[in-house]
Structure formats: structure tokens, C-alpha cells
């Protein structure tokens, strides 16, 4: 319970720095199918932040929500090593552009913490994607499996191509 409380506090702090309002200028988002929001995605790369200090083997698991545009979200990681203690938090996502690209999801976590995640790129085969906050201050690379070194380089290059400084990313162990 102590770890969950720390995680909730960290999310609260992080949400103050993450954009919760959508910018006036709409930056390109990918077009994804509803299956994008099903199953487990491994967090391959991310922008460092207080919330994820000490977290490795991160993941997000999506499952069907109560309505067609709702997604049940479980975010988790292991503390210190891929075999460390599991830390999780649950939220409810709403796909904001459900009738269109299905790429903008707003997730509500406990204590009124809200994050907006926009899918900026999805690989043609659907095996990995890049998600950011609307203002691109935070970026995550997710994959269905741990990538090869060549694939990881491709992922980082794509992050740079969409306007993010790939040198800012960290790549926690899996």
C-alpha cells in the first residue's frame, strides 16, 4: 500500500507537468484500430521522469472498457530489476477521437490524475508504436516484444523524425 501511495503521489506531481489540455494546433497522430487498445505493450523507451525512477520492465496492458470508446489501463513496472517487486496503477482511458483516428486517449488515474496520450506513429505491422503527451514533452516507445538492436535504432530514429530529441530517451531493462 505504501508503494501505491508513493506511485499516486508521483503521478499527481507528473500530471502537473504533463499537458492535460489539448494544444490549439493539432500535431499529426497515427490512425490506429481498436485492437491497438487490447493486450500488453512493453515500454521500450521513455522520457525520464520522477514517476518512473527505479522502474524497469515497464508495460501497459489495455482491455475493453464498459463502453466502445473506453479502455481499462494497467501500467506497471518492476522496481530495480526485471525480477524486482511489481508496482502497478490502474486507470480508465477514453478514446477522445473514437470516430476518427482512435489515436488520442485520456486516462484518468486515482485522485483525479489525468494524462493525455497521443499515438504519433504505429509500425505498419502494428508491432510497435510511439506515444507522446500532446505537447511532445514526454515520449514513450512501446512494442509487443523486446526489439532487436536494429529495430530499437529504427524506433529511436522514428522518434527523432517526428520531432523528439531521441538523445533524451532512457531504455530500461526487460
Question: Model-found features: residue ranges?
Answer:
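Bacterial N-terminal signal peptides
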Residues: 8-17
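A beta-rich soluble binding module of mature secreted/lumenal proteins
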Residues: 19-174
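Bacterial N-terminal signal peptides that target proteins for export
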Residues: 1-8
Amino acid at each position: 500500500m505504501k508503494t501505491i501511495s508513493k506511485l499516486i503521489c508521483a503521478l499527481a506531481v507528473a500530471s502537473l507537468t504533463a499537458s492535460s489540455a489539448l494544444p490549439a494546433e493539432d500535431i499529426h497522430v497515427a490512425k490506429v484500430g481498436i485492437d491497438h487498445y487490447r493486450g500488453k505493450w512493453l515500454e521500450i523507451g521513455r522520457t525520464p521522469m520522477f514517476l518512473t525512477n527505479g522502474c524497469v520492465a515497464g508495460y501497459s496492458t489495455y482491455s475493453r472498457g464498459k463502453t466502445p470508446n473506453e479502455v481499462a489501463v494497467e501500467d506497471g513496472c518492476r522496481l530495480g530489476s526485471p525480477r524486482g517487486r511489481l508496482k502497478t496503477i490502474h486507470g480508465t482511458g477514453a478514446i477522445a477521437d473514437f470516430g476518427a483516428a482512435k489515436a488520442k486517449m485520456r486516462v484518468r488515474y486515482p485522485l483525479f490524475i489525468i494524462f493525455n496520450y497521443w499515438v504519433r506513429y504505429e509500425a505498419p505491422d502494428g508491432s510497435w508504436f510511439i506515444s507522446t503527451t500532446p505537447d511532445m514533452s514526454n515520449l514513450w516507445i512501446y512494442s509487443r516484444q523486446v526489439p532487436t538492436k536494429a529495430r530499437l535504432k529504427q524506433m529511436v530514429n522514428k522518434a527523432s523524425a517526428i520531432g523528439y530529441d531521441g538523445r533524451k530517451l532512457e531504455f530500461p531493462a526487460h
